[in-house]
């Protein structure tokens, strides 16, 4: 299944049905009075988190969604039927944004969560509603309320406990494949990983979700390489595991390149707990390894872990360090709902 983490869609809730102007016509009943029924209510547009989804690919092929209109009222005090709701299914971690792509409307973080994005219009009153002691035969009725329409953006931010960051070919996908059942594409060229990957890691009986995103290069925030758009998938992570390739030219510069891109994307990412690891230590000589470790230590201002995803050296220790942070960090993500307007009702005229 193709991965799509952003989609623009048009939604419209159903219009309310019109009220009816009608009078009783039964034989032998003089001055039968009004009998026009009310219109039915329009259907709502509802967004629901569904199990088994991990992409927004369905919204590439269909972008317009309209709920059903309410039917009109009829004579003999018959009210119109309500329109059917339309439900859009999204994966957990999806955010609803306004058309400006900045205003957050709602953030889905729980399976089964539902949010009414657009309420259907109320049905209009039929003339029977307006009957009074001074107006025995009203000849007016309300039209139904129009439904709401808008363009929105759906943006998926994967929910993971820990995230892997680093330059291309730092060994992120290899590490994910070793510590979990995930099978990301692995090859000896940059940008092998084109889409985020998730894996469930088990360490000493404790499980957590680890996310691997495409590598960052200098200028990613300006669109270089694959850009920095995939960093949104590690925004929810509680801890970042920053991998630096021991075979690169200068480990310290490689570390700073990624940190600068994290800062350019969103300062909050640099505030997250970071564990630094020098990877591929089995591929360099001891003297070179010491130089790279010292360079990385000076740049990161902390002692890096020494690991090898291929050989398995130090991997367990790195995972235990992640688990220690994940166990301490509080849950900070809370769903944010848009303020609901007061329900509309037809006006007495």
Swiss-Prot record:
User: What gene codes for this chain?
Assistant: obg
Domain (Obg): residue spans on this chain: 1-159
Q: Name one Pfam family in it.
A: GTP1_OBG
Its localization reads: Cytoplasm
Q: What class of enzyme is it?
A: hydrolase
Q: Subunit structure of this entry?
A: Monomer.
Belongs to which family?
A: Belongs to the TRAFAC class OBG-HflX-like GTPase superfamily. OBG GTPase family.
Provide GO CC annotations from the record: cytoplasm
NCBIfam families in UniProt: Obg_CgtA, PRK12297.1, PRK12299.1, small_GTP
| GO BP term, pick one | ribosome biogenesis
Q: Which SUPFAM superfamilies match?
A: Obg GTP-binding protein N-terminal domain, P-loop containing nucleoside triphosphate hydrolases
> Keyword set for this entry?
Cytoplasm, GTP-binding, Hydrolase, Magnesium, Metal-binding, Nucleotide-binding
PROSITE patterns the record matches: G_OBG, GTP1_OBG, OBG
Q: Which cofactor does it need?
A: Mg(2+)
Instruction: State what this protein does.
Output: An essential GTPase which binds GTP, GDP and possibly (p)ppGpp with moderate affinity, with high nucleotide exchange rates and a fairly low GTP hydrolysis rate. Plays a role in control of the cell cycle, stress response, ribosome biogenesis and in those bacteria that undergo differentiation, in morphogenesis control.
Q: Which residues form a coiled coil?
A: none
Indicate what this protein is called per its UniProt record.
Answer: GTPase Obg
Any one GO MF term held by the record is: GTPase activity
InterPro entries per record: G_OBG, GTP-bd, GTP-bd_Obg/CgtA, GTP1-OBG_CS, GTP1_OBG_dom, GTP1_OBG_dom_sf, OBG_GTPase, P-loop_NTPase
Question: What residues does GTP bind to?
Answer: 166-173, 191-195, 212-215, 279-282, 308-310
